[in-house]
Amino acid sequence: MVWSMYEAEGLFQSQEEIDNWPLDQDGQGNATLAPGDIKYKDQDGNHVLDTKDLIYVKNSSNPDFNFSLRLGASYKGFFVNVMFQGATGYQQNIKELYTTNSGSLQRFQKYHLTDTWTPDNPGASLPRIKFATANDNNRKESTFWVRDCDFLRLKSLSLGYALQPAVLKKLKLTSASIALQGSNLVTWSSLSDLGMDPESLRGYPIQRSYGITSVSYTHLRAHETLRH
């Protein structure tokens, strides 16, 4: 599968750059554009943005590889267990996550304020904030919105202590341990700066969780009752 979209060339940084841009992106000589809007590549050299400027990009929305790694160690009763999880070789189109519809302000996220273009934030990874129609320049399907979603997540971590045999014997237990546990503690991803979860882009982010667990087992004896 492929995506059909325009090839983005970054964001306009000044009105002068827009005035000198050779490609008419809005059919009005770029009169509706402003600094912070997406600029596109003129593929056929006719200076007009049309279907001839579309390119085909491989739809890699499913990972090429999913992986996990479990590690564990123990020493004199102390133990640690770690699990890492990740995926490589896939991308997602995040346009719909940024361009909210009218009446959808509940989808307004932190990154709409912290990583959108402003004169004081010219290196932002998202366009300027504005009210826009469905055919707005920044809502066109383009490579600008295709983002790398490779990630590595610290899925679980457990740190604990297991009582030693001598202590267990005094307490008449077969085993006992206590551990600090955490899930989804850290995620390394290029989307992290935007506050997006690569595994849950269109849903509620996977939450961190913490807890303390204790487990103990006593000596058990099995009894059988004979019926005559």
Residue ranges and their predicted role:
Residues M1-Q13, N20-D26, N30-L33, A87-I178, ...:
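Extracytoplasmic gating/loop element in the C-terminal half of outer-membrane beta-barrel translocons
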Residues G27, A31, D42-D53:
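Acidic, glycine-anchored loop motifs typical of Ca2+
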Residues F65-F67, K76-F78, D150, K172-A176, ...:
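Outer-envelope beta-barrel architecture signal
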Residues S68-R70, S156-G160, G211-T213:
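Membrane-embedded beta-strand positions in outer-membrane beta-barrel channels/transporters
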Residues A73-Y75, F84-G86, Y161-P165, S214-S216:
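Residue-level signature of outer-membrane beta-barrel architecture
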Residues V82, I178-L180, S214:
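Membrane-embedded beta-strand positions of outer-membrane beta-barrel proteins
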Residues N93-T99, S190-D197:
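Outer-membrane beta-barrel translocator domains and adjoining extracellular loop/strand segments
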Residues T218-T225:
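Conserved small/polar residues in nucleotide/adenosyl-binding loops
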